[in-house]
């Protein structure tokens, strides 16, 4: 699994929390102190908790489990898409539509519509339509792609959520809780850690910090998958023992 050192975290600003007046008292045990009215997160706590979270993601990925990356605010959006794409997993980075998990049946129908429209755009169907109708379908396809593009090939509910901001994505966390899907989340000093199975106390706003978490998670998935392929090959007798 990907290792992230305390030095890496310091350089990325993981230890900078929110202004003290916005704090959530439930995060008290993870706060080292305050500097210039900004809470400082105790990285002595964050590092082992981050390792625990990565271990869990590794165990899910090794069993071919599905990881859903969730980060819909501007600071996280691109990084979430990149990380999920790099490790061939899934993401929501635009807007969390209520019921995305708890109402999967309906979401599945929307995904089917998106795929139908994609096929139509490629097989010449759009060209046979009036300009207005083709434009309307293109707009519908773009809108669906924005919302569902990152989960259109998920093929069912995920096995774990990796959330960038517990406060901003509280609806996603609640849905996962209702369905018994484990949640790994970055939790800043202004957020509520309740409902998060693997809390990672850390800055959820700085782009460098967000990229650090996401890159480590993507690397962890890739390593676990590669390890699984080696094990499978050995079991199948493709790799000779030295």
From Swiss-Prot:
HAMAP family: Ribosomal_uS2_B. InterPro entries: Ribosomal_uS2 (IPR001865), Ribosomal_uS2_bac/mit/plastid (IPR005706), Ribosomal_uS2_CS (IPR018130), Ribosomal_uS2_flav_dom_sf (IPR023591). Belongs to the universal ribosomal protein uS2 family. One of its GO terms (biological process) is translation. GO terms for molecular function: structural constituent of ribosome. This is Small ribosomal subunit protein uS2. Keywords: Ribonucleoprotein, Ribosomal protein. Pfam families: Ribosomal_S2 (PF00318). CDD domains: RPS2. One of its GO terms (cellular component) is cytosolic small ribosomal subunit. It comes from Aeromonas salmonicida (strain A449).
């Amino acid at each position: 699994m990907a290792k992230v050192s305390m030095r890496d975290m310091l350089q990325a600003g993981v230890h900078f929390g929110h202004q003290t007046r916005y704090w959530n008292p439930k995060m008290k045990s993870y706060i080292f102190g305050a500097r210039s009215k900004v809470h400082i997160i105790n990285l002595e706590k964050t590092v082992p908790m981050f390792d625990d979270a990565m271990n869990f993601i590794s165990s899910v990925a090794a069993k071919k489990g599905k990881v859903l990356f969730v980060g819909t605010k501007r600071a996280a959006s691109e990084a979430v898409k990149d990380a999920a794409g790099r490790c061939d997993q899934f993401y929501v980075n635009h807007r969390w539509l209520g019921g995305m998990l708890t109402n999967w049946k309906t979401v599945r129908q929307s995904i089917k519509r998106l795929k139908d429209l994609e096929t139509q755009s490629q097989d010449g169907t759009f060209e046979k339509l009036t300009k207005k109708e083709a434009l309307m379908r293109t707009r519908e396809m773009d809108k669906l792609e924005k919302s569902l593009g990152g989960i259109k090939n998920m093929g069912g509910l995920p096995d774990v959520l990796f959330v960038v901001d517990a406060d901003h994505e509280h609806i996603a966390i609640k849905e996962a809780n209702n369905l018994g899907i484990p949640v790994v989340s970055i939790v800043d000093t202004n957020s509520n850690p309740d409902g998060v199975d693997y809390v990672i106390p850390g800055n959820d706003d700085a782009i460098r910090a967000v990229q650090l978490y996401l890159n480590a998670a993507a690397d962890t998935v890739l390593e676990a998958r590669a390890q699984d392929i080696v094990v499978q090959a050995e079991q199948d007798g493709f790799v000779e023992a030295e």
